[in-house]
Amino acid sequence: MTSKIFSPKISAVIESLRKLPTIGKKSSQRLALYLLDKSPETAIAIANSLLDATANIKKCVYCQALTEDDVCNICSNTNRDDTKLCIIESMLDMIAIEEAGIYRGKYFVLNGRISPLDGIGPSELKLDILQQIIADRKIDEVILAISPTVEGETTAHFISQMIAKDIKISRIGFGVPFGGELEYLDQQTLLHAFNTRTNI
């Protein structure tokens, strides 16, 4: 609950901002007051861009990354290596890997991890689409770039079991601590993790 000093409309803005990741009570209050008092034009610009994005952004038919087109920039790039497929949890992982400049293949974004307690199973992660992509393309290596959490280990094991035995499966590892999230790794650690990936 927000403080009674705020009107219902201000409280609604604060509560909406609190739903964002890493935004707590104080941060949501600060952001709401800044946007409404100091920079209403910024608030309107943010609202308009979000409305436009939610109406026009969809998931790439291949990798499941967010895009305005049916096929994202990476999947449509003919200079990328079609024989390598890196499986990641989120677009934030893709950004980290791309910024490190360590990989030139294609991706598949799970948008989560298998977590029965949270009601997330293989169907929620679109693993049927992943299986079809692997079957349709001449992929010779699948790289599992999944965080080494309990859910990540479960997800990696499930995926490795569903991939044909004639396809090489590797897992990034060294330098990624158990429980660590890929998106927070520095570029050197990420580079080392890719270069020292192990076969499954």
Swiss-Prot record:
Q: Which GO terms describe its molecular function?
A: DNA binding; zinc ion binding
Biological processes, Gene Ontology terms? DNA recombination; DNA repair
PROSITE patterns registered for this protein in UniProt: RECR, TOPRIM
Keyword set, alphabetical order:
DNA damage, DNA recombination, DNA repair, Metal-binding, Zinc, Zinc-finger
Q: List the disulfide bonds.
A: none
SMART domains, per database record: TOPRIM
**Is-annotated flag, keyword DNA damage?**
yes
So what family is this one in? Belongs to the RecR family.
Q: Which NCBIfam families match?
A: recR
- What name has this protein been given in UniProt? Recombination protein RecR
Q: Which organism is it from?
A: Francisella tularensis subsp. holarctica (strain LVS)
